Amino acid sequence: MACACCCCTASLAQFGKCTPSERWTYTDAKTGNKITVLTDTLKNDRFLYQTDPMWTADGKYLLFRSSSRGDGTMVERTQPNGEKKKWKPTQIYFIEMATGKIIQATEGADLGNAFLANRSNKLFISRNENHQWKLYVMDLDRFFADVEHDKVGKPAKYERLIGIFPAEMGRPGGYAVDCMDDYAYITVEREGTEEEKERMMKNAFLPETNQPIKIKPTLCGIRKMNLQTGEVTKVIDTEFKVGHIQASRFTPGEIVFCNETGGDAHQRMWYCTADGKVFKPLYKETALDWVTHETFATKDYVYFNILGFLPRLRKQANGIYRINLRTDDVEQIGQVEMEKDRCAIDGQLVGRGFWHCNASRDNRWAAGDTFGGNVWMMNVATGERHWLVSDTKMRPDHAHPSFSPDGTKVLFQSGHFTNGKRLNLMMVDITNYK
């Protein structure tokens, strides 16, 4: 009844808007698995990147983002360089897993990134307001209670401003929250010195002649914001573009990030501690390795891919690997059967093998999506492979599989029903797999 009431107030405000469940199921024609579709095919929804938490701490709500569920209003802003930019803002939504109903949790044009707390039902939200990067925290328990009783107030009722990022400490980008929910680790671009810029360009990765340079090298770094006081301090500086920052969900003060080139790199994965005392490569690459899509999956392990999508890359070991953070030992988890995964997908690279990976928190399962548009799961102890899902199209975004915190479900996104034009958010139950 509460959901129906909330739907009636949708015309008054988007924040707190509640819509009925869009959940339905189908049977995968190739694998025979029953797939649960969580969102409507008419929308274009996306999960967060598979490295970031998507479940509230109590496991009752699942977060996603969408630019197609609001009122359709386009926003136009004048940029600092005088250019005008027009776009449809992305907002944050939650699926109540018990009922399937969908709740809008943000509104407005200034949303940056969102990150769920680890220890309580809170949501950290960055916004770019008046050319300032601000970090807020939202009380989700209070918000969901008001949604249930159709008494949602303005966003300010549920949010607290944590801090404003000092401009002199760099230009903020993505961030991750420590497992104790006491610090946010924030990537920045910075000016640096001429000597740093010279070293950066000298050491920059040069791809093969047929590969474009997608992301130019940039002096960057990591800063941390105290989530109680808003104080910002330096962690490290880098002489490469920092991307995919992740904080351990198990051990305080451990950070994994990458040298983001948009493709290959001399050294993709890096590790540091929040006090800046440790800053080192994670898995020292050979010249033939193409490492990508690392995931800080468990207490002691980071999972990653060594790609095999090109003929030259298949002349050596490739697939999903993991590295032990305590010993630096590296183990291969496995690879799909290459010939079975060969597939030409319009608008994508033609290749074979795993593209992204993840692992269950108990180290029992690893999952990966492939260039052929399939989602597989592997038993980490035995190497046994299970084909979960077929034909995700890998567009307009990749499948990006991830596990529910209790390890019973694999979540992914798929363009299967729209021929790659829009995404459905989906999940498959894995409790019957041994």
Residue spans of the language-model regions?
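Bacterial Sec-dependent N-terminal signal peptides
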Residues: 1-14
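Blade/loop signatures of beta-propeller domains
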Residues: 14-36, 214-220
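Short, conserved, GDST-rich strand-edge loop motifs in beta-rich repeat architectures
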Residues: 15-19, 66-87, 128, 136-140, ...
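Multi-bladed beta-propeller domains
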Residues: 26-46, 84-85, 93-110, 141-170, ...
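Blade-loop segments of beta-propeller domains
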Residues: 44, 49-52, 69-128
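Conserved beta-propeller blade repeats
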Residues: 45-63, 108-127, 163-189, 237-258, ...
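Asp-box/WD-like beta-propeller blade repeats and closely related beta-sheet repeat scaffolds
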Residues: 107-220, 234-237
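Blade-level signature of beta-propeller repeat domains, shared across WD40, Kelch, NHL, RCC1
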Residues: 398-434
